[in-house]
């Protein structure tokens, strides 16, 4: 069964410390594709977006994490929450649907290494 495409907002996180991020909205996302396929699709799309500043286009992104599910409560964290990584970071070999992505889900897209450094010392610099 083919899924209908859904709308997903992806927050490109360039810097956790400086709270530097840009949201990008994707329409028609197939929930039956693997997380890794969606990551490749986003990475291919980012350099083509005229609305994104160069630093966002050149940054390395490799990890998706659920920020907000539709009809759920939002966290107070301005960039991305640091809790529940096991549940909220999307495993590359699962489908988006199996990972809990639905219509109007918000995801953070970031460099996992940067996230680990920030998580060890979550201090904002602005």
From Swiss-Prot:
Species assigned in the record: Xenopus laevis
Pfam family, one: DUF2340
Name of this protein: UPF0538 protein C2orf76 homolog
Family: Belongs to the UPF0538 family.
């Amino acid at each position: 069964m083919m899924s209908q495409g859904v709308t997903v907002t992806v927050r490109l996180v360039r810097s956790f410390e400086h709270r530097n991020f840009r949201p990008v909205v994707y329409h028609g996302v197939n929930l039956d594709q693997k997380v890794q396929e969606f990551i490749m699709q986003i990475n291919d799309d980012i350099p083509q977006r005229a609305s994104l500043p160069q630093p966002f286009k050149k940054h390395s992104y490799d990890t998706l994490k659920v920020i907000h599910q539709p009809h759920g409560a939002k966290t107070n964290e301005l960039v991305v929450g640091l809790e529940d990584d096991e549940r909220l970071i999307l495993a590359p070999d699962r489908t988006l649907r199996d990972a809990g992505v639905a219509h109007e889900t918000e995801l953070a897209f970031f460099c996992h290494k940067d996230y680990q450094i920030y998580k060890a010392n979550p201090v904002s610099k602005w």
